[in-house]
């Protein structure tokens, strides 16, 4: 065809359009010599169908040790992969013999109309600066019905569970990493088992639907095995009330935001969660790179344990369908990150949201999934994990293995391979799914917001006014529990009213535990003084003299003679010839009274009759005498 003929044919076209526009020609008219190309109409994708997925890429996003690392491994037909066991010790060569098939069904999600990364980052930055989620108008939200995973089909649910169980590494010596950003000279010893967030990317045959499976928490409980150290930091940061503080001393502390008992700085916690070396920021970066490779694909999220929680947070952020298994309750970090919430929903309670498109499968014997792995004797606590969150967003699909199978609550039931073989494959029917609305996290805690510049040190000044008591006493007659003499006590209390209280008492009848006399109290204020005069009682001196020649267990067994000299008082003289076994005298007593002058001293006293008794018969080991003879001496 000549150039003139080509130009003529172009001129006869109805219109000229760009190459990427959809063009639909009208039926050719009878007078047109050319038949226009028939371009098929591209309508909306089908909401139902069957998808066969294959592993396409493996992503690694560095976090703690290498925060700037982001690399991708493309899976090719000749790529040799090893499957890593749950404990990270056993490896076996992978053969993809069984296809991963899942079906789709219509799913309604309420999400943002503009979900570009730059827009989402603006909302998150505003939430970090203000301390709360951005309030958006209803016009910025849409209700989209799209093709989502069919959570009522058992085979589809099993497929997603197997995706979360697969943990692959390339056979050593055959690595072929593509570095998205970061340095290109990482040593071969820096494998992805040492640091970072790992994601496995599956795509169907038409690349219209992709699944991002995020790697979950390493099962090792103590530091040094795989990514367990980094996983523990993120677990305690996202799912603890205050970064592992305020609980068991075994919990690993990952921030310093606690101010006092059950009181914490929420701004401090949120800043730590949004650091670039945390899993949530790494998950956003990983998701943005995957969507750059598949811009028109429908994205589904899945994950197990910590990976399931991160998948759910991404789903809430970008409005994606999510299927998780034994996921850590993630409503607490969703509220703290300030994720946008539709009108009519409290952003502080994301578990009350509807139409999230998230489904969390788990069973009642898993303490991590049920939010109970935080007791003093739990394995999580002994391993240093502070798993205090208890609420999930979206729908919970719970297998009651405790009631149905009699299982005990144990951390060993948390492993995804055990969940697949002992739960998902055993139960004939899938459990019903329902939201968990009546659930609250960290109810004992109080959180406050700040501008981020406050010091974490607090000081408290307490002023106390105490009374001062002055006591002066001289004891002449001490008793068992105090002095039996008269006492004078003066108490002065100093207060802001400068009131002085003085109490004076004189005891005439002392008792064992205090004075039995009535108490008289005189309060003195700035007024004319009052003088009170108390007469001094008369003291009678008493003298007693004794000499013991025959001491006993509890006293003297000698005949005793006591002479008391008191003016105008009687005197008594006694001599005991027959003392008792413990106390007392069996002799007859004689009393002499001298009404005018004291009686004569002992040498001039008149001798009294003396009786002597001899016991001839006794009972009760000699304590009682029943027969005696007596001789009277004069």
Curated annotation (Swiss-Prot):
Residue ranges of the TM segments: 5-25
GO CC annotation: multivesicular body membrane; vacuolar lumen
Enzyme Commission designation: 3.1.1.3
Sequence ranges on the Cytoplasmic membrane side: 1-4
Keywords: Autophagy, Endosome, Glycoprotein, Hydrolase, Lipid degradation, Lipid metabolism, Membrane, Signal-anchor, Transmembrane, Transmembrane helix
Recorded GO MF terms: phospholipase activity; triacylglycerol lipase activity
Record topology, Lumenal segments: 26-634
SUPFAM superfamilies, per the entry: alpha/beta-Hydrolases (SSF53474)
Gene Ontology BP, a term: piecemeal microautophagy of the nucleus
Record: active site: 305 (charge relay system)
Oligomeric and partner information: Binds to both phosphatidylinositol (PI) and phosphatidylinositol 3,5-bisphosphate (PIP2).
Functional summary from the UniProt entry: Lipase which is essential for lysis of subvacuolar cytoplasm to vacuole targeted bodies and intravacuolar autophagic bodies. Involved in the lysis of intravacuolar multivesicular body (MVB) vesicles. The intravacuolar membrane disintegration by atg15 is critical to life span extension.
Annotated family: Belongs to the AB hydrolase superfamily. Lipase family.
Full protein name: Putative lipase atg15
Organism expressing this protein natively: Neosartorya fischeri (strain ATCC 1020 / DSM 3700 / CBS 544.65 / FGSC A1164 / JCM 1740 / NRRL 181 / WB 181) (Aspergillus fischerianus)
Gene that produces this protein: atg15
């Amino acid at each position: 065809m000549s150039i003139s003929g080509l130009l003529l044919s172009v001129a006869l076209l109805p219109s000229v359009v760009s190459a990427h526009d959809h063009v639909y020609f009208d039926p050719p008219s009878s007078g047109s010599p050319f038949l226009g190309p028939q371009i098929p109409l591209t309508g909306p994708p089908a909401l139902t169908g069957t998808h066969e997925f294959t592993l396409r890429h493996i992503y690694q996003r560095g976090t703690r040790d290498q925060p700037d690392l982001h690399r991708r491994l493309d899976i090719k037909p000749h790529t040799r992969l090893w499957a890593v066991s749950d404990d990270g010790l056993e490896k076996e060569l992978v053969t993809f013999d069984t296809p991963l098939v899942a079906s789709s069904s219509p799913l309604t999600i309420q999400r943002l109309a503009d979900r570009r990364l730059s827009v989402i980052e603006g909302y998150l930055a505003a939430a970090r600066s203000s301390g709360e989620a951005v309030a958006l108008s209803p016009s910025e939200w849409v209700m989209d019905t799209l093709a989502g995973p069919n959570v009522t089909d058992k085979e589809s649910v099993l497929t997603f569970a197997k995706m979360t169980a697969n943990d692959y590494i390339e056979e050593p010596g055959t690595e072929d990493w593509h570095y998205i950003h970061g340095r290109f000279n990482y040593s071969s010893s820096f494998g992805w088992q040492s640091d970072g967030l790992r994601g496995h990317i599956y795509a169907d045959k038409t690349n219209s639907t992709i699944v991002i499976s995020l790697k979950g928490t390493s099962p090792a409980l103590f530091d040094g095995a795989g990514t367990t150290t980094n996983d523990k930091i993120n677990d305690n940061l996202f799912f603890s009330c205050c970064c592992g503080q305020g609980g068991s001393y075994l919990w690993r502390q990952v921030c310093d935001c606690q101010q006092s008992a059950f009181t914490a700085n929420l701004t401090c916690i949120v800043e730590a969660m949004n650091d670039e070396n945390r899993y949530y920021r790494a998950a956003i970066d990983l998701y943005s790179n995957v969507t750059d490779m598949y811009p028109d694909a429908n994205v589904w999220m899945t994950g197990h344990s910590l990976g399931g929680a991160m998948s759910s947070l991404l789903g809430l952020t970008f409005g994606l369908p999510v299927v998780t298994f034994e996921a850590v309750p993630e409503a607490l970090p969703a509220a703290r990150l300030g994720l946008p919430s539709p009108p009519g929903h409290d952003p502080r309670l994301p578990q009350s949201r509807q139409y999230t498109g998230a489904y969390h499968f788990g069973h009642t014997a898993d303490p991590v999934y049920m939010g109970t792995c935080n007791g003093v004797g739990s394995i999580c606590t002994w391993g240093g994990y502070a798993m205090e969150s208890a609420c999930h967003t979206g729908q919970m699909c719970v297998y009651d293995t405790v009631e149905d199978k009699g299982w005990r609550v144990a951390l060993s039931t948390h492993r995804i391979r055990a969940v697949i073989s002992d739960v998902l494959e055993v139960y004939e029917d899938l459990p019903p799914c329902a939201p968990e609305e009546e659930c609250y996290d960290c109810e004992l805690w109080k959180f406050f917001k700040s501008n981020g510049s406050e010091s974490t040190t607090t000081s408290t000044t307490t002023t106390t006014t105490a009374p001062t008591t002055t006591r002066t006493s001289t004891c002449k007659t001490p008793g068992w529990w105090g002095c039996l003499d008269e006492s004078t006590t003066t108490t002065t209390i100093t207060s802001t009213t400068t009131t002085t209280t003085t109490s004076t008492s004189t005891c005439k009848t002392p008792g064992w535990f205090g004075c039995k006399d009535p108490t008289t109290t005189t309060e003195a204020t700035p007024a004319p003084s009052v003088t009170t005069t108390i007469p001094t009682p008369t003291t009678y001196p008493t003298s007693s003299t004794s000499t013991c020649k025959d001491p006993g267990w509890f006293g003297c067994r000698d005949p005793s003679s006591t002479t008391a000299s008191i003016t105008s008082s009687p005197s008594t003289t006694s001599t005991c010839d027959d003392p008792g076994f413990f106390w007392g005298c069996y002799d007859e007593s004689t009393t002499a009274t001298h009404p005018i002058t004291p009686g004569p001293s002992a040498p001039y006293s008149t001798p009294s009759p003396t009786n002597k008794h001899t016991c001839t018969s006794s009972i009760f080991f000699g304590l009682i005498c029943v027969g005696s003879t007596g001789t009277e001496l004069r």
